[in-house]
Regions:
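Residues at structural and domain junctions
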Residues: 18-19, 49, 85, 118, ...
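Catalytic cores of carbohydrate-active enzymes
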Residues: 6-8, 74-76, 89-92, 98-100, ...
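Aromatic-rich carbohydrate-recognition surfaces in CAZymes
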Residues: 1-70, 93-100, 203
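Short glycine/proline-rich turn/loop motifs
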Residues: 12-16, 83-85, 172-173
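Tryptophan-centered motif/residue detector
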Residues: 31, 82-85, 137
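A short, charged helix-loop
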Residues: 69, 73-87
Length: 205
């Protein structure tokens, strides 16, 4: 798309391009970055990477805009990812985990193309990992202490109070200005382990 949007579906026969449902898809952009990075790592095709760098940069810029308030997490509208039949929106864990992986891909691409690390991006990756760990897992802390890097302390406190049935058992699916979603998102929980965001005790849950 003109701003870096990646289509979620392409019909080469009918020449139709779809960018998603009513609100478009956030995760198509994330999977595009991850896929490009994995293909490049597997093949060593530098020509492919060099051709795609301008597109990758547009996608990166668009994702930054989708943070809305520049605080590190992507805001996902209703129908904004693959799970468009589920009523979830806001700061969806699945999309944040993909965003973390996509940013790690961007860091590797930058180092290959420019021969040096993008230190600002490295800092963003570290912050995103902390945000995920702090805001999506309700630990059963008896002393009442709160994690660092809370996105919104009032939302977190209310969510923690209502999460007695799932506290310290699984990652929360999402949160938004309306509060937390306590639904068990199997894919997001698996990704949290596969992408090394979960520590060993959380994996064992």
């Amino acid at each position: 798309g003109p701003h870096g949007e990646i289509p979620s579906n392409v019909d080469p026969v009918a020449r139709r391009v779809s960018y998603g449902g009513t609100a478009g898809r956030i995760d198509a952009n994330l999977w595009f970055l991850i896929g490009c990075g994995e293909y490049w790592r597997a093949t060593g095709d530098e020509g492919f990477l060099n051709r795609l760098v301008p597109v990758i940069e547009k996608v990166r810029f668009l994702l930054g805009a989708w943070e809305f308030n520049n605080r590190g997490l992507l805001y996902v509208p209703l129908t904004g990812d693959w799970a468009d039949e589920y009523l979830h929106n806001g700061y969806v864990l699945y999309d944040q985990l993909l965003y973390l992986q996509a940013q790690q891909t961007l860091a590797r691409v930058h180092e290959s193309v420019h021969g040096s690390a993008d230190h600002a991006l490295v800092d963003r990756i570290s912050r995103l990992r902390h945000l995920i760990r702090s805001n999506y897992w309700f630990a059963a802390d008896e002393d009442g202490s709160l994690p660092d890097d809370l996105y919104h302390e009032v939302l977190y406190r209310k969510g923690l109070k209502a999460a007695t049935h799932c506290r310290d058992r699984h990652w929360m699916a999402s949160f938004s200005p309306a509060g937390y979603s306590y639904r068990f998102d199997a894919l997001a929980n698996v990704l949290a382990s596969l992408l090394d965001d979960a520590h060993e005790a959380q994996r064992q849950r």
